[in-house]
Structures are given as C-alpha cells and as structure tokens.
Amino acid sequence: MSGTSQKHRNFVAEPMGNKSVTELAGIGETLGGRLKDAGFDMAYTVLGQYLVLKKDEELFKDWMKEVCHASSKQASDCYNCLNDWCEEFL
C-alpha cells in the first residue's frame, strides 16, 4: 500500500462497521453529499455497489463518475480503498 493516503490506510486498517461514505479514500464532503443524495450514505453501501459490479475497476469508476461526478483520481482512490479493504477482510 505504498503511495496510499493516510485516509486510505486508516480505512483499510479496521472493519468497516458503520463508517460514513466520506471515510472512503477519494470521497470528501462534496462527493459524499452527492453519494448520500443518491442513497449511498454509508461506506458499506458503496462496498455493495462495488461487489454488485463484481469488483470490476472500470465499471466501478464509471459508476462513480456517473453517480457523483467523481474525477478519475477520486474514483481510482475509492476503488483502490475498497479493493484493499476486501483483500484484508473478505
């Protein structure tokens, strides 16, 4: 996980529980608000979408761009965060 943000490392370091969507790497207040408006208020709801898309990086990034207008970097950071979390806990 070299080159990852502190936010990414913090998220991947422990079970997800009831963390807010804004605790995901790449998701700040603006994107978090857009995701919440779309019904994705908790990190586990975004994880659910990631799993529904069968962990496919391009599909997930496209979904992020469509739902909350994430940039490529934001979508990539979120994907990598969820992917690393799944490797650790699933």
UniProtKB/Swiss-Prot annotation:
Pfam families (UniProt xref): SAM_BAF (PF02961)
Inactivation phenotype: Death at the larval-pupal transition with small brains and missing imaginal disks. Specific abnormalities in interphase nuclear structure; clumping of chromatin and convolution of nuclear shape.
Gene3D superfamilies linked to this entry: Barrier-to-autointegration factor, BAF
Major site of localization recorded for this protein: nucleus
InterPro entries found in the cross-reference section: BAF, BAF_prot, BAF_sf
A single BP term in Gene Ontology: chromosome organization
GO CC annotation: condensed chromosome; cytoplasm; nuclear envelope; nucleoplasm; nucleus
Keywords (A to Z) from UniProt: Chromosome, Cytoplasm, DNA-binding, Nucleus
Any GO molecular function: DNA binding
Compartment(s): Nucleus; Cytoplasm; Chromosome
Functional description taken from the UniProt entry: Plays fundamental roles in nuclear assembly, chromatin organization, gene expression and gonad development. May potently compress chromatin structure and be involved in membrane recruitment and chromatin decondensation during nuclear assembly. Functions are required in both M phase and interphase of the cell cycle.
Family listed: Belongs to the BAF family.
Quaternary structure, from the entry: May interact with MAD1.
Name of the featured protein: Barrier-to-autointegration factor
Origin species: Drosophila melanogaster
Record gene name: baf
